[in-house]
Amino acid sequence: VVMSVLIVSCKGKTGNTITVGSDKLDNTQSYFSESMHTVARCDTGYYYLDKCSASDDNLMFYDDKSEESIVLCNKPQCGHDGEECMAYISGSEFKSELYYYNSYIYMISSKGNLVQISADGTQRTDLGSICVLSGQDSVSMCFNDGYAYVSQEITGDIEGNVTVRLYRFNLDTGSSNKIYEETGYGIGINSLKTYGSDTFFLKTSVSKDDKGLYSLEGKGIFRITGEDTECLLDKNVYSYCIDADNNKLYYSGLGDGTIYEYDLGSGKSESIYKSDNDTGYFYITFDGNYIWMDDEGYKNMAMYFNKQSSSLDYTLYQLDRDGKLAAKRTIPDEEKIFSIMHGDSRRMFMFSFVNNKIVYIDKSNIEKGDIKELR
C-alpha cells in the first residue's frame, strides 16, 4: 500500500464552484445509501445478497424481464445451502457490502482485499489488498474511472477516538494508495459517492454532553479528484446528493429539518423544503427523477442514543427537484425495517427483520404500493 495522505479542513470555506459533468447513474449507483449496501443494479436487473444462515448469504440475481430471482450457481443438484455452492458468501470471509461496476460484481474480503466476481457468478478474482481490516472495521466503496474509492472506519479506542482512512485502488494494476487519514473523537466519513467525473464524501463527528446526550455535527462536504482532496462546502450537513446533469447539489442541514439546493456553478444556496414536524435531518438520494428522503438516521439517534422515542416508524419522502413534496409514506414499526437502502428510479429497497429479507416498494406508487420481498 503506497501512502499519500492529506488531512483537509473545511474551516473558513463557504463553498467552491465546480462543474460535475454528466452522470450515468446506473454506473455510479449513487442512488443507493451506504448504510446497508446489499443490492446493486445492473443493465437487466439486480444482484443482491439473500440470507442462507444467520451469518452467511447466497449471491442472487433478480431478472427484470421474468420478475424472478435465481441463485448464481450452476452446479447440478446443488442445495444452495453451504460453502460448496458457487453462490455462497461466507460472513467470516467477506464484508456484507455488494457493488456492481462495469459488468462485474465487487465485494471486499474480511482481510481487506477487493474481490471481483463475474456477472454469472462462476468466477471470483482477488485483485489485491486495499488495506488491512480488522473484524469491527466498517467500509464503504464507490467507483470512478477504473478506480475503487474505499473508506475505512477503525473502531474507536477506550477514549472514543476513531481513525478514518480513504484509499484509491487501481482495478487494472491492483495498487492501493492511501489518500486521506484522520483520527479524532467520534469522527466519521459518510456518503462516499461518485457523481459525474468526481467522487465526494461527507465528514461528521459525534459528541456527548454533560447529561449523556449525543449530538451529531457535519464537518463539510469534500471532493476527491484523482488523489487530491479538497473541501467543497463548509456547512453543517447530514446528507447530500447531486443532480450532475444540472450541476446542483442538494443537502440536508443538521438540526434544522431543511433541504437546501446548492448551485455548483454559481455557489448560491437556497432552502427548498422544510420539515413539517420535529425531524431534525434527513438522509437524501437522487435517482435521476426525484429527490428521496428518509428519517431513519434521525429516529435511530433519538431512540438508541438519546432514549427519546419508544418506536421506530420511519417516513419516506419524494420531492421534485424544486423541493415540492410529491409523495410521503410512513413505514410502521411492525414492518421491522432495519435499513432503508434507497435505490434506482424503479424501487425503494429496505431490509426487514420480519423474515430477514430485502423488501421493496415500487417508486411509481410509493404512497400505497405493497411492501414486497425481493425474490
Per-range role (PLM):
Residues 11-31, 57-82, 112-132, 159-183, ...:
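Surface-exposed loop/turn elements that mediate protein-protein interactions on large endomembrane-trafficking
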Residues 6-9:
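C-terminal motif of bacterial Sec signal peptides marking the signal peptidase cleavage site
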Residues 42, 55, 65, 101-102, ...:
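Short loop/turn segments that connect beta-strands within the blades of beta-propeller domains
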Residues 1-2:
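Sec-dependent N-terminal signal peptides
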Residues 95-167:
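A generic tandem-repeat structural signature
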Residues 280-314:
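Loop/turn-rich, solvent-exposed surfaces of beta-rich toroidal or solenoidal domains
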Residues 31-42, 81-99, 133-145, 184-196, ...:
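Repeated scaffold domains used in trafficking and secretory/extracellular systems
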Residues 47-49, 107, 149-152, 201-203, ...:
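Residue position within the beta-strands of beta-propeller blades
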